[in-house]
């Protein structure tokens, strides 16, 4: 059941996500304000646009969550070889705007190229970033200085919720994800929420957990 959010309500709220459809969609409407996004992500909820049949924001909260635990990240032999070559440098929050705009120009989790990541969404996540609730990882080519890969997402407590990634070179986004996992290990991060399963993420250690386990980790001190 997908319920309409009452935009005239005195307080920001979401319906109970347990009654969503099989894909996890349970609500429509609302906005991308910082307060609503923080309420959403702290409860395992994320926004999604479907321009084909629904111009409003769709809100998803799957009861099975595809995640990567930082200490379970799988680094293949070929990736280890690539990383040892020191061809790329990796940083965090060095150019959030460049990363999110690069993601908007690639086919991500939606079919419409770039359409899902319009200027309104870029502005919303940039606002989260400016408040310390969104972060980016950048992969730079050491020879050319070009940004060749990266990812961005929302940070809530010890959880990183991945939103999108891009790669202009083979394995560029994998390098970013490996760096993120190692960074979280060093700084007490507990989990990377991948949102959707892909062969790419599964090969790197992604697996499903229940929504209940997800929220237990989300609420850890």
Where are the language model's segments positioned?
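N-acyltransferase acceptor-side catalytic subdomain
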Residues: 1-221
């Amino acid at each position: 059941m997908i319920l309409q959010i009452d935009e005239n309500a005195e307080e920001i709220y979401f319906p109970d996500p347990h009654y969503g459809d099989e894909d996890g969609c349970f609500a429509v409407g609302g906005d991308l304000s910082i307060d609503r996004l923080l309420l959403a992500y702290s409860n395992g909820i994320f926004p999604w646009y479907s321009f084909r049949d629904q111009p409003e924001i769709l809100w998803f909260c799957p009861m099975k969550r595809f995640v990567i635990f930082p200490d379970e990240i799988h680094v293949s032999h070929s990736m280890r070889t690539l990383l040892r070559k020191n061809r790329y440098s990796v940083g965090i929050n060095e150019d959030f705007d460049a990363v999110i705009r690069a993601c908007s120009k690639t086919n991500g989790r939606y079919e419409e190229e770039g359409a899902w990541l319009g200027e309104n969404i870029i502005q919303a996540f940039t606002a989260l970033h400016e408040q310390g609730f969104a972060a980016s990882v950048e992969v730079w080519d050491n020879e050319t200085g070009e940004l060749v890969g990266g990812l961005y997402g929302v940070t809530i407590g010890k959880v990183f919720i991945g939103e999108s990634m891009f790669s202009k070179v083979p394995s560029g986004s994998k390098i970013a994800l490996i760096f993120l996992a190692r960074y979280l290990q060093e700084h007490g991060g507990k989990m990377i929420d991948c949102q959707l399963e892909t062969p790419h993420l599964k090969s790197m250690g992604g697996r499903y957990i229940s929504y209940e386990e997800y929220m237990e980790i989300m609420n850890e001190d």
